[in-house]
């Protein structure tokens, strides 16, 4: 085989251009010709269809038996209220479902900011309008929020025979990504002018930052494609054995660069965990045995790793890489 994948250009520049509070453009260059569309289309599909998140899956509204009921003193129809609830942006920490309540006395608007939540549940768009009370009436509701991935129709969760009158089932769009578009522009490196520049335009609901969403999607693609790298046979395998295995650069980053709280960082260093690669190989059980590191710190660590497409309990075949030990601090 003439040449290897190392002959291909590898992107050197990643530029994040903020377009608003929840929207950003991520620019990647230079890419070999054609790779802009190859990577852009793959990332777009993953961002739109496979991102995990939370959504309202069920609502119980006082005085309402079904979505076609009428409510005295409420400007919106029940169908419109349910549509508004589907746009609720919720982030849950270390749990798979939660029950939220809302109780408002009219007249006036009912917004997502009126929802009462537990300490480990956040509403990221408190300005969202749920309904408008035109009279001095009360609006009381219970909302069930669940964690999932992609899109799930209400009919996929329960059959008609299992439904209780008054419990309104909602189709759930769990993805925190609202919109993704990409363009491929021309790039140049020295005398080469036939290269690609990929521009991803990503908008989220605020639960994840756009760059976090792209990082997660890229990590998911990498994980899915890694099985092909292990295929046996041919010169490819021989060449891989001749050279030292590549290590994901993020694993080489010191713990301090994760921007954890001082308490969490010090607890990890006390256990000789100085690099991200050291951390991801530990399990939750192992970390909870660390002195002064509680569940709150563990949750912070898990969320920080997830934002980088990583998790606890990972297996690293080539860790630590050669040369890293020279800089490691003995705790």
From Swiss-Prot:
Region (Alpha N-terminal domain (alpha-NTD)): 1-232
Region (Alpha C-terminal domain (alpha-CTD)): 247-331
Protein source organism: Alkalilimnicola ehrlichii (strain ATCC BAA-1101 / DSM 17681 / MLHE-1)
One GO CC term, this protein: cytoplasm
Keyword set includes Signal: no
EC number: 2.7.7.6
Gene Ontology biological-process annotations: DNA-templated transcription
Key words, A-Z: DNA-directed RNA polymerase, Nucleotidyltransferase, Transcription, Transferase
Protein name as annotated: DNA-directed RNA polymerase subunit alpha
Pfam families for the chain: RNA_pol_A_bac, RNA_pol_A_CTD, RNA_pol_L
EC top class, as a word: transferase
Coiled coil (residue ranges): none
Main function: DNA-dependent RNA polymerase catalyzes the transcription of DNA into RNA using the four ribonucleoside triphosphates as substrates.
UniProt remark on domains: The N-terminal domain is essential for RNAP assembly and basal transcription, whereas the C-terminal domain is involved in interaction with transcriptional regulators and with upstream promoter elements.
CDD domains in alphabetical order: RNAP_alpha_NTD (cd06928)
Subunit-level organization: Homodimer. The RNAP catalytic core consists of 2 alpha, 1 beta, 1 beta' and 1 omega subunit. When a sigma factor is associated with the core the holoenzyme is formed, which can initiate transcription.
Highest taxon above the source species: Bacteria
């Amino acid at each position: 085989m003439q040449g290897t994948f190392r002959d291909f250009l590898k992107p050197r520049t990643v530029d994040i251009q903020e377009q608003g509070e929840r929207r950003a453009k991520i620019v990647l260059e230079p890419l070999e010709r054609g790779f802009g569309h190859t990577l852009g289309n793959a990332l777009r599909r993953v961002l739109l269809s496979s991102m995990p998140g939370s959504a309202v899956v069920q609502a119980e509204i006082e005085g309402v038996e079904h979505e076609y009921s009428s409510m005295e003193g409420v400007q919106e129809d029940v169908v419109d209220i349910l549509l508004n609830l589907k746009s609720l942006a919720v982030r849950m920490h270390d749990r798979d479902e939660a029950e939220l309540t809302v109780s408002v006395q009219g007249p006036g608007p009912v917004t997502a900011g009126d929802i009462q939540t537990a300490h480990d549940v956040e509403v990221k768009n408190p300005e969202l309008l749920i309904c408008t009370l035109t009279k001095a009436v009360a609006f009381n509701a219970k909302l069930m929020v669940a964690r999932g991935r992609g899109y799930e129709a209400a009919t996929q969760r329960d059959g008609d025979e299992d439904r209780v009158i008054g419990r309104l089932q909602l189709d759930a769009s769990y993805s925190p990504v609202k919109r993704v578009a990409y363009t491929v522009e021309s790039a140049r490196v020295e005398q080469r002018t036939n290269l690609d520049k990929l521009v991803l335009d990503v908008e989220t609901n605020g639960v994840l930052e756009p760059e976090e969403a792209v990082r997660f999607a890229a990590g998911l693609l990498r994980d899915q494609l890694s099985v092909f790298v292990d295929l046996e046979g041919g010169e490819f395998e021989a060449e891989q054995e001749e050279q030292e295995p590549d290590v994901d650069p993020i694993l080489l980053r010191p713990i301090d660069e994760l921007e954890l709280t001082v308490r969490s960082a010090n607890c990890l260093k006390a256990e000789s965990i100085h690099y991200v690669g050291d951390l991801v190989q530990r399990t939750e059980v192992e970390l909870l045995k660390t002195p002064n590191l509680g569940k709150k710190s563990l949750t912070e660590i898990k969320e920080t790793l997830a934002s980088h497409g990583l998790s606890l309990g990972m297996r690293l075949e080539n860790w630590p890489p050669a040369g890293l030990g020279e800089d490691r601090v003995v705790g």
